[in-house]
Amino acid sequence: MNQVSDRLAAMSPSATLAMSQKSSELKAQGVDVINLSVGEPDFTTPTHIKEAAKKAIDDNFSFYSPVTGYATLRNVICQKLKKENNLEFTPDQIVCSNGAKQSVCNVILSIISKGDEVIVPAPYWVSYIEMVKLAEGTNVIVEAGLDQNFKITAEQLEKAITPKTKGLILCSPSNPTGAVYSKSELEALAKVIEKHPNIIVIADEIYEHINYVGKHESIAQ
């Protein structure tokens, strides 16, 4: 008897975590391994972050928080978006969650219904397509190879859109390629999206400060 749901059965294990597990097993056997799988820092948590976490416990931040996050945090996020990205948002437009992975998954589960299509530029982070599967959506993979610096074009985006298209996942700077979309490239993509108001752009910009190519621009700008 199958004990899991069809949604879970349709998903694939994370290749990243599988590689990390294999690395740990080899290290335990005494093998010298360089682990390039998971994106973990090569340093421990900075002291000021540890102290802030300890202080939060001492200050009794151990009860249920507001669903959208603490107001003070949402205010600071708005200030960051204004200062660093020149984007105007109010705290009421901000929802906090436990990291980028949960944020992206929450959005996908909130907007994607069975049969909805989500455009995913490739190469892509392995978890994107699994999140769409979990929402019972359909992944539409758009290949962007080395010849185009791993970035999809406006023409490719337009061609991939169908009446079932509900979302576009756009990661810049990109995981895993490091590719960064320029302002003009984002504007070209935005012009395509503007013609299809039912499509929601899921902009994963978690790596905006890990950028070795050029200036980070947000499609929200």
Segments from the language model and where they lie:
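Structural signature of beta-strand start/N-cap positions in the alpha/beta core
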Residues: 32, 117, 138, 166-167, ...
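Short beta->alpha connector loops at strand-helix junctions that form conserved
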Residues: 122, 141-145
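A short helix-loop-beta submotif of the ANL/AMP-binding
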Residues: 134-140
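N-terminal small-domain helix-loop-helix segment of the aminotransferase-like
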Residues: 2-99, 106
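Conserved PLP-anchoring active-site segment centered on the Schiff-base-forming lysine
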Residues: 110-132
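Active-site phosphate-binding strand-loop segment of PLP-dependent enzymes
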Residues: 146-217
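Short acidic capping loops at alpha-helix termini that bridge into adjacent secondary structure
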Residues: 88-94, 114-117, 164
